[in-house]
Amino acid sequence: MKYMIITVVILFTCALKMFCEETEEENHLAIPEDPYPSLPLRNYSCNNMACPLKHICGCMPTPITPETPFRDLDCGCYHEFDMMPVCV
């Protein structure tokens, strides 16, 4: 009887450990939900960006609006003298 109880405890411990490992793995693989799915993707880098003559690549903060109540960065080509975005 004593060995049966020990066996049951060991099996229960192993099963619990396997369940916990699967849960950690599932959490690791879970893709976080995008809190702002309707917002367009922004470019956060000037790498490999070719800007026209007299323009520079830079990152400017976006304005805070009711639709986007947080500060974001928008990287792209800007006029060198006034940092206004280049219209494509």
Swiss-Prot record:
Top-level taxonomic group: Eukaryota
Signal peptide: 1-20
Subcellular location: Secreted
Tissue specificity statement from the Swiss-Prot or TrEMBL entry: Expressed by the venom gland.
GO terms for MF: toxin activity
Main subcellular location: secreted
Keywords: Disulfide bond, Secreted, Signal, Toxin
GO cellular component terms, A-Z: extracellular region
Modifications after synthesis and translation: Contains 3 disulfide bonds.
Family indicated by similarity: Belongs to the scoloptoxin-12 family.
Protein name according to UniProt: U-scoloptoxin(12)-Sa1a
Source organism of the structure: Scolopendra alternans (Florida Keys giant centipede)
